[in-house]
Amino acid sequence: MDSALNRSMMELLDHVEYRLITGGEDQEAIYRLRYNSYRRSGMCGPIASGMFEDRWDNLPNAYRFGVYCYDQLVSTLRFHYITSAQPYSPSVDAYPEVLLPRLARGETFIDGTR
């Protein structure tokens, strides 16, 4: 179905870019965006740095992406590639009884957050 809404969405997507963030100013921008979002929703209190970083951000199996629209950071995604060698992720902490046996059998997972 070729509607005006579909065309508008497709045109907008032409201006959306996903970037792997490995550090520096882009990483700080992610932490600031997250902090501002969490503050507005009441999920965290004031932090002097104006940035929210958690223990999952810098693990060896963590990959952070910035979502940019018209070159403006608008969202973030974080993935953990979970293996038996690197079983670190929010989901493994939340559901170890389910995931650890599967990892021990050689299964691997992608755990996506924010």
Regions found by a protein language model. Name each.
Residues 4-57, 62-69, 73:
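Short amphipathic alpha-helix that is part of the acyltransferase structural core
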Residues 77-114:
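Conserved acyl-donor/pantetheine-binding loop and adjacent beta-alpha core of acyl/acetyltransferases
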